[in-house]
């Protein structure tokens, strides 16, 4: 009986919840975006079922994305945000995440106002790639909506990291489920802060 229940129960996950009355995503929930919502719902569900990344990182990056989506003031902004989220979900589905540690920046127990998603990839026994995206206002021009971080290092030197994108030097302090990132350089503070590990 229990096996039959699981086989007959459809699994459904919505990328955008349009069921709540008076919600702040009315434009996105309009009929004109139904195809994009369906596509995003399918990608979201697929990423939850297929990826080897922790499902919590997919759910929390989804919550962060919805926060950015709510800031959109134009149809173009909404379209861009949907496309960007589809790209992010495709990465979760298509790339091996088993050797990747995901971190989100937190402040006072919640997502940081300046949202940052950092990934630490173990490329080989002696090579680590660290990449991050700091999200900015989604109403900015597409090329000004985020700031990238990219660094390559080794396991022995993963506490002293230089961002190749902006030549910023950081001190990384890893402790269990927390990553503390510090810098003394002016203009490099965007990626400094406390990050929570998703595993």
Provide a role label for each language-model segment:
Residues 1-6:
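Bacterial N-terminal signal peptides
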Residues 9-14:
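Sec/Tat signal peptide C-region and signal peptidase I cleavage site
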Residues 17-59:
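Amphipathic, heptad-repeat alpha-helical segments
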Residues 21, 94-117, 195-198:
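Tryptophan-anchored aromatic micro-motifs
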Residues 55-58, 89-104, 118-124:
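N-terminal helix-cap/turn-to-beta initiation motif at the start of protein domains
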Residues 59, 67-69, 134-176:
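Contiguous, well-ordered beta-strand patches that form the walls/edges
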Residues 112-150:
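N-terminal glycine/threonine-rich, aromatic-flanked beta-hairpin/loop signature
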Residues 142-157, 183-199:
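Edge beta-strand at a domain terminus
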């Amino acid at each position: 009986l229990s096996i039959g229940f699981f086989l007959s129960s459809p699994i459904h996950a919505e990328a955008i919840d349009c069921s709540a009355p008076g919600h702040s995503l009315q434009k996105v929930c309009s009929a004109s975006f139904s195809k994009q919502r369906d596509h995003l719902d399918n990608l979201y569900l697929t990423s939850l079922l297929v990826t080897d990344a922790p499902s919590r990182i997919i759910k929390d990056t989804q919550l962060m994305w919805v926060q950015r989506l709510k800031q959109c003031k134009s149809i173009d902004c909404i379209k861009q945000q949907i496309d960007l989220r589809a790209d992010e979900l495709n990465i979760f589905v298509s790339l091996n995440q088993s050797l990747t540690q995901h971190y989100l920046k937190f402040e006072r127990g919640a997502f940081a106002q300046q949202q940052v998603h950092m990934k630490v990839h173990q490329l080989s026994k002696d090579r680590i790639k660290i990449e991050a995206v700091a999200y900015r206002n989604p109403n900015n021009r597409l090329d000004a909506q985020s700031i990238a971080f990219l660094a390559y290092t080794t396991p022995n030197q993963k506490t002293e990291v230089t961002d190749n994108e902006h030549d910023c030097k950081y001190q990384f302090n890893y402790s269990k489920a927390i990553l503390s990132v510090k810098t003394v350089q002016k203009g490099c503070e965007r990626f400094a802060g406390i990050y929570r590990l998703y595993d």
